[in-house]
């Protein structure tokens, strides 16, 4: 879900006019992976562009390397491709990682950047929605859905294992207490 809040503030002891800050947040982007749908991310990028008035944009996520670099990378790569359509995504990723160590955490986020750049171009009328883009998007959604299901299954197994371990520990402690009495 996208959220936008606008704040005005004037720093104390500074004679400058007040600042206007737009805080945009996207709470549906899971950590270490990426959303299924590129549309909200592209909408957030377009909103950030429209609000910044050529002022700096600050981007952050909890760790500062995965989602933040993806978000920045989408806009950065889209601009680079518009300037020169011969740029290679892998070179752009290397460039991003030179600016932020370990930026973009794996193939899912890397693929999501591709999807979002293409979605930007589709929305801007540069690429058609039907055809290769739709097939690529469908493949991505299928792959990520399977990945998410596998991760959920692993988390469930891990949780069950921890419960069993705790139960075993409690039984062991309980039998030890009975023996010492």
What are these regions (language model features)?
Residues 1-181:
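Cys-based phosphatases of the PTP/DUSP/CDC25 superfamily and their flanking regulatory architecture
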């Amino acid at each position: 879900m996208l959220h936008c809040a606008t704040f005005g503030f004037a720093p104390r002891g500074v004679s400058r006019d007040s600042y206007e800050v737009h805080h945009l947040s996207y709470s549906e982007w899971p950590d270490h992976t990426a959303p299924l749908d590129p549309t909200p991310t592209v909408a957030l990028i377009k909103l950030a562009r429209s609000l910044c008035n050529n002022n700096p944009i600050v981007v952050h996520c909890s760790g500062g390397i995965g989602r933040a670099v993806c978000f920045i990378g989408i806009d950065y790569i889209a601009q680079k491709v518009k300037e020169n359509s011969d740029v290679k995504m892998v070179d752009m990723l290397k460039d991003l990682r030179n600016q932020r160590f370990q930026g973009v955490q794996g193939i899912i986020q890397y693929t999501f950047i591709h999807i979002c750049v293409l979605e930007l171009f589709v929305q801007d009328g540069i690429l058609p929605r039907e055809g290769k883009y739709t097939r690529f998007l469908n493949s991505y959604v299928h792959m990520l859905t399977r990945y998410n299901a596998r991760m959920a299954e692993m988390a469930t197994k891990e949780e069950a294992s921890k419960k069993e371990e705790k139960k075993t520990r409690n039984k062991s402690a309980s039998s030890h207490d009975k023996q010492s009495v």
